[in-house]
Design a protein with these regions (language model features):
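Terminal and domain-boundary regions
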Residues: 1-93
Length: 93
């Protein structure tokens, strides 16, 4: 079981720290309290790295700092999600 899946089973509030993805209705800093809604699960199916930027609420500050620091794993994942969402958007046009 992945770390994020375990958090959801425990119903711990989690927050999405990745970029806005309008096509999926997923917005930065959305909080989920009782598992992930179906639209988020669909987004993760298309862009699996989204799951890596869904963290416990109490890790928000630390995760944001890592995203803002160039070269960190979190910053690279953030950028990759942006790129993949743009590719999906371009395919629909």
């Amino acid at each position: 079981m992945e770390e994020n899946e375990e958090m959801i089973v425990n119903n711990e509030p989690v927050i999405y720290t990745g970029p806005n993805i309008f096509d999926f209705g997923l917005f930065q800093f959305q909080v989920f309290q009782e598992g992930l809604p179906p639209y988020v699960k669909r987004a993760i199916e298309k862009i699996p790295d989204i799951n890596r930027l869904i963290v416990p609420v109490d890790e928000l500050e630390n995760t944001r700092a890592k995203i803002e620091k160039s070269g960190t794993l979190e910053a690279r994942i953030f950028y990759k999600i942006q790129q993949e969402s743009e590719k999906l958007k371009a395919k629909r046009k």
